[in-house]
Amino acid sequence: MNWIREANYKEDMEAVVEPYVAARTEAGTFERIKGQKIYYEAYIADKAKGAIVLSHGFTESVRKFTESVYYMLQAGYNVYAVDHRGHGRSYRPNDNPYVVHAEKFEDYVLDLEYFTREIVKREKKETGPLYLYGHSMGGCIGAWTIETYPDLFKKAVLTSPMLALKFPVPTPIMVAGASIIGMGKGGRRKKEPLSPVNAFTETPDFENSCDSSKCRYLYYFDKRLKDSALQTTSPSVGWGLEAVKACKRAISKEETAKIRIPVLLMQAGNDTMVDNAGQNLFASRVPGCTLAQVPGMKHELYMTDSDVLIPYWEKIFAFLG
């Protein structure tokens, strides 16, 4: 395994990782709902022993996972990743390019199942072991997916999954306030941002980011500066309401009881974005779930320095087998 270190990170990403991944990339779109194109990328390993479906987090895109895909390919996995609706190059259900809106959180789940069934399995003819890797919002989507479609994947990795949210006020108060706002203008205000946003902030702010690795944060921030498709920053009122409901559903006794596959839950010890209590409850309710905490790290565990990142990936690959 060729690990990318911090000393020459940007240079190594541009000279080694990007060309390697690009040479193995196939891009495409699909429409589960007519007129709503979902963008995806397939990355084909030189010698694959299985395949990973990658489900990214809130305001992210497939482009944020180039380094992660590089390691997955080297480990012998084909990788299939979508830009979830409202993100990246996929269909946007609202006009503000900086705001992520969701009519129904379940649409993410239905998209992911359709993508796995129709693109990964049928079109790309993946017949070997199929695994799920879901980060944050993508982890909540993943949890819902393996509850609803328990035989779709062989194993699942949920990394800092969004199973309970952190708000500056108690969740019931936030939900009540957002619901009142959302009812304005005949419900049209659900597409408006929870906090006003009309531009992408062009000044990096590593200290308040979700990352523990500065070079990785700056590398992707530079990508976002140059690509308007990567500049989503804020949730809509509707997204916030749907996310709260999705978290509650995903950790419920009724739904967690449906999970039949092994799950590895990687938990960030210093997560300021999601409430780890939701992850703890989920893990306690899923007999086949192994919870592994990475002490002191912020939300995005795949964006840590190599002294943490290498053991993180080694644990994941050992789990997948």
Tell where the protein language model's regions lie, with residue ranges.
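Active-site glycine-rich loops that stabilize anionic/oxyanionic intermediates
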Residues: 49, 57-60
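Conserved alpha/beta-hydrolase
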Residues: 62, 69-95
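Alpha/beta-hydrolase active-site loop
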Residues: 100-121
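Short alpha-helix in the alpha/beta-hydrolase fold that links the catalytic acid
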Residues: 261, 275-284
